Amino acid sequence: MANYTAADIKALRERTGAGMMDVKKALDEADGNAEKALELIRIKGLKGATKREGRSTAEGLVAATVENGVGVMVEVNCETDFVAKSGPFIEFANKALAAAVASGAADVDALLAAEVDGKPLSELVIEAGALLGEKVAIRRLARVTGAVVDAYLHKTSKDLPAQVGVLFAVDGEGEAATTAAHDVAVHIAAYTPNYLLREDVPADLVDSERRIADETARAEGKPEAALPKIVEGRLTGFFKENVLLDQPFAKDQKQSVAQVLDAASAKAVGFARFRVGA
């Protein structure tokens, strides 16, 4: 008869994020000793690291923080939502975020090379995968700097950690700038802009949109004399959809994001938006 309880299984699953059958097998082999079972799960996980390498990691979380005018955000992935909400995975993601802040890493490769607890973070990624029994990966890293930086994390499900993260930075000061930065960060989470300014949109993309607008208007039989105005109007619509400062503000559609920031004497200087798996 097994010398462990359902509570022991639950506790070890919470510690490791491992599946129920894996936990039961480890407890059986360890004669009910939780610490020995934990070691067995880790050993089994390390042996399976090569097999996990090709697996898809579409779940996970976004973690972000702001320190001294610098916002840092990471997306950390795993295979299942069960692991994504587990304590060990969340702990590892927070450790990766702390390493990103401390190291000043500019990209994921630099972050993986950063030393944490006396070893490169890349080794901790492997160890986390071994413990959790799933492939774990740091997908991307963002860093945004400004006088005021807001980090906004959004849960798409109450049972999961944040799936959407935003960093938004402005040059400005005072409560008005801080409030505007936060409100726009929330807006970015919902409205998914691709660019900060019109000038950031690649010229070839603008040319393509202008050409499509012209050809569409001609196909609709619009008068030749009206084409320039129609094309510019449709191009404006493209900018409103894709450029942050041109977008109608989420909390007040009568204002653009640019107008909201102007009213707060704040100038947008950068943003980043992550959604897990997107």
From Swiss-Prot:
Location of this chain's protein in the cell: Cytoplasm
CDD domains, A to Z: UBA_EF-Ts (cd14275)
PROSITE patterns in UniProt: EF_TS_1, EF_TS_2
Any Pfam family matching the protein: EF_TS
Record keyword Nuclease present: no
Molecular functions (GO terms): translation elongation factor activity
One cellular component (GO) term of this entry: cytoplasm
Ranges where the record places region Involved in Mg(2+) ion dislocation from EF-Tu: 80-83
Main localization, broad class: cytoplasm
Top-level taxon in the UniProt lineage: Bacteria
Keywords: Cytoplasm, Elongation factor, Protein biosynthesis
Family: Belongs to the EF-Ts family.
Function: Associates with the EF-Tu.GDP complex and induces the exchange of GDP to GTP. It remains bound to the aminoacyl-tRNA.EF-Tu.GTP complex up to the GTP hydrolysis stage on the ribosome.
Protein name per its UniProtKB record: Elongation factor Ts
UniProt source species: Renibacterium salmoninarum (strain ATCC 33209 / DSM 20767 / JCM 11484 / NBRC 15589 / NCIMB 2235)
